Curated annotation (Swiss-Prot):
The keyword Ribonucleoprotein does not apply. The gene is FLO7. One of its GO terms (cellular component) is chloroplast. It is an enzyme of class 1 (oxidoreductase). 2-oxoadipate binds at H107, R111, Q289, Y313. Pathway: Amino-acid degradation. This is 2-oxoadipate dioxygenase/decarboxylase, chloroplastic/amyloplastic.
Amino acid sequence: MAVALAGARSPGAGAILSLRRLAPAAAAPVRLGGSGTPGTRRRRGIAMAAAASAPPAPADALPKGADSFFRTVISNMEKVYLSRNPTAKTILELVRSYDGDHICYDHFAFRTFGVDGYGIKSLAEFFTDFGYVPREELRFPAKKLRALWFSPPTNDGYTGTGVYGPLPRIFISELLVDELSPQSQDIIQKYIRTSGKGNKHATLASTSGELTWEKPIYSDFQVLSRESEYAAWTLVNGYALNHTTISTHRLISDIRSINKFNKFVEDNGFKLNSEGGILKVSPDGLLQQSSTVADSALFTFADGITESIPRSYIEFAERLVLPQFKDLPNDEVNEHHRRDGFEVGNADKIFESTSNDQLTRRSA
């Protein structure tokens, strides 16, 4: 994943974070808007696994026309992402060359400002309109973030790959703007005010790669960078895809093992996010993730200053078979037999893929 950018440096293991499991929408509605306390939910303790209890049933498969339209939209999001991030584009090409055309996406991830309707809700409503189901909230107190992930509608039977294969999970995070310093809050609010009703067209912004607010000045970017690298990233990238994630276990060659996949990536000259170790593993051992360091690109700010900014990265995830299905023959194992959801501890470290520490290490 997850994931992505980063605010304050990751806290130690003892300081980490909390995750609350949300009840299925029919039983307890999920609040998608802005920052603050989410809707009704059951407390599940720290960093609990997503697969700990029965998930809500997925929505029915989309009608043919809706499915085609939805895939065209996410394909356009992907095109913007690949045009700006040569690392992701090259790795996808290398995997296809080595493994054949078997790439499936585990999830897509986005970053938002959790204020005045520009947070999770601004993107979520598009996905829920097309059958996605809100699942769990994750909290990252040190980074002043919350996130919500969404499971796709039923999409069995798709034999395509990439955006034309099984639909990805969606992971949307938001910065809790009202927890920042007054100076940073003022900067973010200043740009939000120039957006008009841009939050209502977040999906369009993601497919076009355009900001819905005025292009920022460099000094504002610098101020946000000092307090929250996530805030600075979002200011200059807006609703663009933060990362896509290859589902390694859906590949067919030896690199379906994430450890071999990581070696494959490094052997081809790419640096992986080293925060907390190259491989991020959930406490149950069933969700294993890694990611590249974000690409950088020159950006000309509104005041004419041109500087390098972080763009996006690509993640890799292997979801292992749940214990109750461990005796299933390999050819009978489907995605619902594997570990689902996300893990706060993993995602917290994946967020660091756009941090200055990782970017500096990449260029070293």
